[in-house]
């Protein structure tokens, strides 16, 4: 049965209540701006949810996994088999993201978008496979345009299921050996940058491997230059199955007015594509952290994003997005619970 191509009807947030919301924030018992980035974060959430009581319900971490053909060229410190091994580790609860999700109260779901060999007989892995690893992007397209559409449809259904269960915050993580190469290529294509400005060391490759990685991405961009006529075509030529489904899920979550928490370099590349498809997605994105990956800061600046954390993370998995949840909850709580100057009988500091 053929899947229909999803279209996303995303409304921009209303700024009609901005003055009321900002005044409510400013009249809390503190000097204006004293809570730093938590204040614009509270404003953003109030724009999305309305200016009365804010809330986070059933926060959910989605970790999308997929393998990359370019990984066979040795662009990572680890072979592609590690993607499958880490997916098993997620399912058994032993990875960093499992630990953080248990600590912080996230529901965790792991999605196999297309690792080389599926994990059999293990509960807790959602099968949304688009293939057994992408094409090697320096030699051929990563996938077909029809595959991108199928991935978007799967992601839309996934988000709808969580939305129906009452979830209003979804965080995005990933796992895929070679996916920093795909993300850097996407960044270079969409932002029209030199590859050297986008490519980093990923999980910690040598200078020699870094040069090879850069060369392969340059070959990929040259090979697909004429075919990359829009953001979906960029995904088809350069993307990963997990990046495609993250992009579709971000679009679907924004359509449903959910809070979208973006992790590191790869998740931000998916966000870049989503915003290029529909600029209104940006209103719903909360950027968790600035990673160690060279190029991430430039992408964040392009998206006018001020990440909440800078911890030197370079793991992926959604770890930074998980660690940002207490700060997002703190923004909600101060907005809802903190006394105003008049409530407390204190002379306003303005």
Swiss-Prot record:
It is an enzyme of class 2 (transferase). It catalyses: 5,6-dimethylbenzimidazole + nicotinate beta-D-ribonucleotide = alpha-ribazole 5'-phosphate + nicotinate + H(+). Its EC number is 2.4.2.21. Disulfide bonds: none annotated. PANTHER family: NICOTINATE-NUCLEOTIDE--DIMETHYLBENZIMIDAZOLE PHOSPHORIBOSYLTRANSFERASE. The keyword rRNA-binding does not apply. One of its GO terms (molecular function) is nicotinate-nucleotide-dimethylbenzimidazole phosphoribosyltransferase activity. Pathway: Nucleoside biosynthesis; alpha-ribazole biosynthesis; alpha-ribazole from 5,6-dimethylbenzimidazole: step 1/2. Belongs to the CobT family. The active site is at residue 317. One of its GO terms (biological process) is cobalamin biosynthetic process. Keywords: Cobalamin biosynthesis, Glycosyltransferase, Transferase. Catalyzes the synthesis of alpha-ribazole-5'-phosphate from nicotinate mononucleotide (NAMN) and 5,6-dimethylbenzimidazole (DMB). This is Nicotinate-nucleotide--dimethylbenzimidazole phosphoribosyltransferase.
């Amino acid at each position: 049965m053929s899947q229909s191509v999803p279209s996303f009807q995303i409304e921009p947030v209303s700024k009609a209540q901005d003055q009321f919301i900002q005044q409510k924030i400013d009249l809390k018992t503190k000097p204006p701006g004293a809570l730093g980035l938590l204040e614009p974060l509270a404003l953003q959430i109030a724009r999305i949810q309305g200016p009365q009581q804010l809330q986070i319900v059933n926060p959910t971490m989605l970790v999308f996994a997929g393998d990359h053909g370019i990984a066979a060229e040795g662009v990572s410190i680890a072979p592609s088999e590690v993607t499958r091994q880490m997916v098993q580790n997620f399912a058994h609860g032993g990875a960093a993201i499992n630990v953080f999700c248990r600590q912080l109260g996230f529901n965790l779901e792991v999605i196999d978008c297309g690792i080389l060999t599926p994990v059999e007989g293990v509960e807790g892995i959602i099968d949304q496979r688009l293939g057994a690893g992408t094409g090697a992007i320096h030699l051929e397209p990563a996938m077909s345009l029809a595959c991108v559409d199928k991935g978007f449809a799967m992601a839309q259904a996934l988000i709808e299921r969580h939305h129906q269960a009452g979830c209003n915050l979804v965080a995005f993580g990933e796992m895929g050996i070679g996916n920093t190469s795909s993300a850097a290529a996407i960044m270079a294509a969409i932002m029209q940058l030199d590859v050297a400005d986008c490519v980093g060391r990923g999980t910690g490759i040598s200078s020699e491997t870094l040069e090879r990685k850069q060369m392969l991405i340059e070959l990929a961009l040259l090979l697909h230059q004429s075919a990359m006529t829009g953001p979906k075509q960029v995904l088809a030529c350069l993307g990963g199955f997990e990046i495609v489904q993250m992009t579709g899920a971000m679009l679907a979550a924004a359509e449903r007015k959910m809070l979208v928490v973006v992790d590191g370099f790869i998740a931000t590349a998916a966000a870049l594509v989503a915003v290029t498809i529909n600029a209104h997605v940006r209103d719903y994105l909360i950027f968790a952290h600035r990673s160690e990956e060279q190029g991430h800061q430039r992408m964040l600046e392009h998206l006018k994003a001020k990440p909440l954390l800078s911890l030197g993370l370079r793991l992926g998995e959604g770890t930074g997005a998980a660690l940002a949840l207490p700060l997002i909850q703190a923004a909600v709580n101060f907005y809802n619970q903190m006394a105003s100057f008049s409530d407390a009988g204190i002379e306003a500091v303005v």
